[in-house]
């Protein structure tokens, strides 16, 4: 059996549930039902709902074989786990921020000052790398308040849009850490349970598919060479003969190809110009590596 620890609430919960569904492992019964455990469509893969901040230690200590949580939390806990895959969601930027009316312009200006944060380990590493000595003060919330009540001169805190900083009359002067959500594994479990790599492959197939689109089109045989030159495809386009029609004077071919999603606009326009018609652009659910 493989036990996977996933966030039980917060901004990481819904994207995590979605990637399981997209990977063909939908979870039956979510954390909203107040359950601690749930099942997937694979009888050997079970789900453990936990606080995102606790998941690194659950995986490190073997309470879970696999986990999904933010790299900021993994790094902060110093967990001895194997990072298997960047899942590309849940981006969190830890920024160094100071009062907007202060004279601090860069991290080096905070030599000997107090910095409040919910991420003391990441903050210490950040300032040590810069060679700046500061007094790191751990807080458990409302970090933005600390410079205004004399507890700290600056903060290191999560910021996405910067709106919270603006509301609290703070300005970001540097990026201390950038994080996304990772699939992690217990090192012993990874060595002994082959199915963990199957789970990684399933998630990887979803991520690969998000970057690609499937193109289908009809192409006159005389235009095939020009069309093939336009299509970059993963391993070249697939070409199939279309049943001839009494209304068509030229043989028609069906051409299928997988292309990068961000190239769709350019490629479709080029295909039309060299003779392709009836072009369909289809999203892809999974691409197995």
Curated annotation (Swiss-Prot):
InterPro entries: ATP-PRT_HisG_long, ATP_PRibTrfase_cat, ATP_PRibTrfase_CS, ATP_PRibTrfase_HisG, HisG_C, N-reg_PII-like_a/b, N-reg_PII/ATP_PRibTrfase_C. Catalyzes the condensation of ATP and 5-phosphoribose 1-diphosphate to form N'-(5'-phosphoribosyl)-ATP (PR-ATP). Has a crucial role in the pathway because the rate of histidine biosynthesis seems to be controlled primarily by regulation of HisG enzymatic activity. Belongs to the ATP phosphoribosyltransferase family. Long subfamily. Pathway: Amino-acid biosynthesis; L-histidine biosynthesis; L-histidine from 5-phospho-alpha-D-ribose 1-diphosphate: step 1/9. Feedback inhibited by histidine. One of its GO terms (cellular component) is cytoplasm. Its main location: cytoplasm. It comes from Methanosarcina mazei (strain ATCC BAA-159 / DSM 3647 / Goe1 / Go1 / JCM 11833 / OCM 88). One of its GO terms (biological process) is L-histidine biosynthetic process. It is found in: Cytoplasm. This is ATP phosphoribosyltransferase. GO terms for molecular function: ATP binding; ATP phosphoribosyltransferase activity; magnesium ion binding. Its cofactor is Mg(2+). Pfam families: HisG, HisG_C. Its EC number is 2.4.2.17. The gene is hisG. It comes from the Archaea. CDD domains: PBP2_HisGL4. HAMAP family: HisG_Long. It catalyses: 1-(5-phospho-beta-D-ribosyl)-ATP + diphosphate = 5-phospho-alpha-D-ribose 1-diphosphate + ATP. Keywords: Amino-acid biosynthesis, ATP-binding, Cytoplasm, Glycosyltransferase, Histidine biosynthesis, Magnesium, Metal-binding, Nucleotide-binding, Transferase.
